[in-house]
Amino acid sequence: MRAEALFCRGRFTDAHIELERAYAQIRGNGQENMALCCDFLAWRLSLCAEVEPELTLEERREALLRQHNASWLNIWNATAAYYHALRGEPERIPELFAQHRLSAVNILAPGKPMMEMFENQVYLAQGACAKVVGRSEGLLAMCEGMHYALVALHVRVQTAAAYERLGKHTEARALLRQALSDGEPDGLVMPFVENYDGLVPLLAQEIRSDLIDRIVELGEASRQRKMRNVRPRALSALTEREFEIVRLMAQRLSNREIAERLFLTEGSVKQYVKQIYSKLHIDGDTRTKRRRLNELLEAKA
């Protein structure tokens, strides 16, 4: 998909345009697998740019449950697992990935390297770095056998980050250099950006290049964005949509303005706000409730 290729190069606006074209082409024609692939990109893009997926992950899952298709749910599980792993939210990763039960799922051979790469990202989010290192040789052999160069690039980057966190700096630098060499011809920056926090000490030791400069630029921007969007523990009971509404309320947007921003009805926003206050056990008049909500939002995660 062209949108995916543009995203991997860090061209977020162009990727967003192509993503919307892809959604427009498949809308209403039953190509659910393609729609789920688009969703996977949309959620990763939302971590890097002002892109709001049409449905929250929870809403998407509810829609898929009504269609009783296990393979579609497995794709959703993979998307949610990777997204929450990138956000550093291991507690929100779906059970299938959080408990590493992929072996219980029938995955067709062409999809297996990608699924295993997702699981690697989950292991990293859980701090299981030795697992990532231990799996890497087998995963890279699988990727080579199937000519999955992009997945192999992700695995090398993940393994470099794991080695670095384990204090194995020599091994980490060797893998990073190979990954940089693999990514440079096509300007593939996102595998590095998505693992930027674990690569910062390694990148600082490398001779600067256009590729490294771009990785650092996007990685730092991603860090700042993640810090702005971090969810305080006091708000952990909220769904993605509810937390999104809380952030917009903190910007002093009215219910009508929030509805316009999220393509909801004003009535739906009012219902969400009511649910938010109920879940957080916030009482009082409107001004008091908003002030208390802002206090919770500003609390340390």
Question: What is each PLM-predicted segment?
Answer:
Residues M1-R2, G10, I26-L41, L64-A80, ...:
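Alpha-solenoid helical repeat architecture
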Residues E244, R252-R291:
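Recognition helix of helix-turn-helix DNA-binding domains
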Residues E4, A250-L253, A299:
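Short helix-capping/turn signature of helix-turn-helix
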Residues T13-A24, V51-L64, E89-S103, C129-L140, ...:
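Alpha-helical repeat scaffolds
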Residues E116-A125, C129-G134, G138, E144, ...:
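Linker/hinge segments immediately adjacent to helix-turn-helix/homeobox DNA-binding domains
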